[in-house]
Amino acid sequence: MFAEDILRDYGSFISEHDGKLKLLRDKVPNRDVSESAQCVYMSPVVEVNFMGNDSMAPDRSFEESELVANKPLTTLANLCNQCRNLSRKAKRFQLAFLFSDFRLDDTLPPHTHTSEGSAGLEGSLVRMSSSMDFFCQVYFLLNRMIVILQNLWRQIAASVSVPMDINEVHIFAVFDAMSELLEHIVVFNELANQSKISTMWALYKKWLMNLSNSQSANLELNGLSTSLMDIENLITKDFFRILLDNLMELKKQFGLNSVSPITQHSNAYIRRQLLDVDANPSNELKNYEDPKHIIRLTTFVVVVHELGIQMEGKLVKNVIDLVARHKQVPLNRSVFWSPSGFLSLHAKTLMKSSARSQDGQGPKVHSTVLEKFRLSDQRTCRQLGVQLSLWSIQMQRVFDVGVFGHLKTFLQLILNGHSYADQVNLLAVALINRHVALMTPMTRNDWIVVSRLLQYLKVIQKTFESNQINFVRFISSLIQWQKQKVIHLLHTTKKKIVVLKLLQRKINFLATIKLAEKSIMGFPSKQRLTFVNLALGEFLDNRLLPADNQKLIKSILHRVNSISDIMRNIGGQLNTSESSSLVYNHWFLDTSVLKEYTELQRNPYSLQNLVSVSHHLDKIMAMFRGSRCPKQSANDLIIEFLSNHLEFFLRVEALSHLFQSQDQPFQQSALDYRLCINAVAVENDGDYNIIKDHLENYFTATFYNLTTIAPHDWKSYEKMRHLANKVLQLQPIDDHLPNQIIDQGIDVLQIMRNIHTFASSYAYNMNLQVFVETNSRSKHLDIIGTRHVANSVQTHGTGIINTTVNFIYQFLRQKFYTFSTFLHDEQIKSRLLKELRFHTEHKHSKSYQSYPYERADSFLKKIRRLGCSSNGETYMDLFRKVITQVGNAVGYVRLLQAGSKNANFRNRSYKTRFDSNFSCGGSKVHEATEGSIREYEKSLGHMKECYSDSTNYFKLLLQGFQPFLCNPHNHHLRTFYLITPALIMNYIDYRVKQKLKIYKKDQTKISLFEDGFAIGLVYILNMLNQQTEFHELGWSQTITQHLNAERSKVRDILAGQQRTAPEQLDEKLHQTVAITERHVNAYEHEYNLLYATLSSSEIFFQ
């Protein structure tokens, strides 16, 4: 217990501390966005990383060579590595730039002059200030790109000026790295020009300078102005023009001997880029789906033109035609780029002889062609799903059997996984970009294809993450195996080069191969492999080597490159640096489509992948947007759907016995989601979302609330809880609510406050000690018994009995006032006085043995002639109801006393077997212990007092009213016993009619018993001291004689008919006699029950 308390306190402290940190983080306006952008990849809890440290310079392990050719290769390799690092960082910054408008959240126009508009605009400017650090980093990044591009051109010019045979292959690799940087500069330029920041920049500068004038020195203002001018170059100006201006300085440094080789290589590179752009002529939307090729080609052509490098006229014409065909290229969902406008702005001389311009902002595609693309995407998605399933099975099989005997298969599986991930990523981005370029909204099927592709990416990522230990063990061996192959091929190639006749070329080739061997001997990091690619690129296209060796070297290099970066590529397909388009487009995914797609997932594995990828992308968006995503995640949607669906399933199963048997039950296609309950937990922002726990909590709360609202239907919810446990394997917590059976129901306090309603709407059974509701709107009748009262007494304490008796006393006062008013009425009092004179005159005569039946019947008929109420009841019926309500109130007192005894009897289990005295006497005990002993003895004494029969509430109720009702002034009450015969006759008629109604339908207010009348009658007779006078009437004897006379009269009629015509008995007469006899028997039965109840009731008041 002590350890549990410590853990509970520690947990509450951590929760409170976490809440304070989250609150503080939400309140801080200046949240560093770029810091979060650098830590995007969410690694698992335990991750094994076998990648080498790429930050180590690869040339540290190289030996300095005497040949000059080694230094250009090393320099170009380092510059290409820097280009790759800058590109990876640029992708992260581009995604953060895309969400910069969301962070501003400027919903009010700048010209609003109201206080709310000023406050909203100032808030946007404050958030803009918090992003200045991020814009500074982007500015530094772009400046670094300009420096790298200058160094690249300078190094290329220096390399080609050396009189050596440098092949085009490694120059093309340098041009590829350069084009990639140019692409990122164009993207940053368009993002800045088409964002809200550029429109608000002038206002922001004015606001910032006004804010700083009163609080800053001149030196600080000068520094601020300089910084703002630098950032303004990024946001409002053409940064690509700044790049071209910086490159113009290099034009003066180019010598005549370097211009011609650069021109030759540049034209060859442009020619190759044109072939890549037009590689798939069947898909005319290829460059819209993946616009990087046309962006790189256009930017490279502009840079070459700006440097004054001569391009072939045919190449220029082809480039202009290509640009004219692509008016607007989508960079992402909200930013477009115009290649023709870009060329017109930066290379006007090339556009002078431009081809015919095409109207329209985008390609015109017929709906049938678009439908063809949609069907092709769905078919490709299905094929990728099948291939990934087979790939994952084969990968697991290789791990189970052992990799060392299947290194070739293992290598092929890794490369296939890498290829599948690239295909999935490209297909998803291409589908989105195609719709953006065509300006057509994505349909539900398109979003479902994108969601399924995201699941495929998560499947590949999980396959590699779940087998990290095996990859660490086997990939090292695999790399060693491939390295030995590469080294063997290098030795073979070296032997081939020895036969060359040109000494200088032979020395250069041998030195390059030697450097490649030294590079490949270490761990094949990206820096090392970049150098190897550039080094081997010098003779890959050389015709002196055999074609088979060239092909094999290309294949081996490609595999080594893929394996060296396999963990980053596969694990990073959902990372922002690899697929920023997917992350940004996931923000626009419609919640209704995501909800519909999640409802289609009936496999826990696919559901888990969808929830995991949704969490991953939402988490990345929250980092870049600076706040949580307001949309519902896939986990919330699936939990909401499963909760509603499984609740409906449990309701149907619980009520299945009410359904009729179906003729064809197998035609109903009911979806089974039970397997989704066992989906594995998914981590999100430090919390693990477990679908099973959410469902158990939902059903626990639902069953509790429904049982509280409708306690009469507690069995249905208990059955649903049982089905949830047995069928769904869920364990909802028991609600521990009292079930509404005989010993549970309406609370005693509620009855006490509504005693007038209770006495009129419940019927009392003296033998069973229960009250039963006479009329109810529901299907069930409420029953209140001894155990129910005992439970209420245990809940509220025994003191509630005295309070309830006081309420009943007040209720009886009202009823006795009505009782006295009725007997004081002149119509009633005069007739009772007449009956009193008759009874007084004849009670001593021998012929007068009992009160005549005829006089009671006549008295009842005269009362009936006085009139009826609105619902057809006579005054005698209303008076009988008053007596019954008085009896119900007295019977409820008896039920309370019995329930109190039952509760005290239950409490005896806490009492010791021996009547020991716990008083300490002279012993010294703690004060708290002594106080507990006193409270225990006090409670025990109170229980004994309540359990004993010393308190007789019937006598208290008699003594409370007798002084007033037996007052000589209330002489009209002395004749009450004379109305009892008529009152009993009215009661018997009422009970007989009630029991006849039981066999009829649609009858309300029917009761099998009503012992409250007998108790009320005996209670009033005892209170008025008229019990002896009532017995002197001998009414039971009168009723017996009357019923015997009626029965003999029926027999005489039947005997007379038999004597007159014994052979011709009337059938109708027989039926009439049978009905009359049955009626007499019913009256006799009711009279016997009444007199038995009256005799039992007299015992209570003795």
Swiss-Prot record:
Keywords recorded for this protein, A-Z: Endosome, Protein transport, Transport
Compartment list: Early endosome
GO biological process: one example: positive regulation of cell adhesion
InterPro entries: WASH-4_N (IPR028191), WASH-7_C (IPR028283), WASH-7_central (IPR028282), WASH7 (IPR027307)
Family: Belongs to the SWIP family.
Assembly, per entry: Component of the WASH complex.
Name this protein carries in UniProt: WASH complex subunit 4
Species the sequence originates in: Drosophila melanogaster
Top-level taxonomy: Eukaryota, Metazoa, Ecdysozoa, Arthropoda, Hexapoda
